[in-house]
Amino acid sequence: MSGGRDIKKAVCRHYEIREAALSKSRRSVENEARDLAIYLLRYVRGERLEKIGEEFNLSNYSSVSNAISRVKRRLHNHKFKKLYGKIYDSLF
């Protein structure tokens, strides 16, 4: 099973961003890469919402829950689901 750092690296590699970009949070600006990393940490690693929030500098665990909900909605989009599959497969 992949660690949290491996998940972050895989997401950053696919989105071609630096890991620091995952921790940047700006009000009303979506960060698809961060949301996906959060989702993977929750469902691949089984991390607690509070711990994930700490890793991404999110002060409220409900922000983590909202990110997970956004990914669940996006997974209905074929292109996003394909991207998710590539990243997920690269972890194992």
Question: Where are each of the predicted segments found?
Answer:
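Basic, alpha-helical nucleic-acid-binding regions used in initiation and control of genome expression
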Residues: 1-36, 40-92
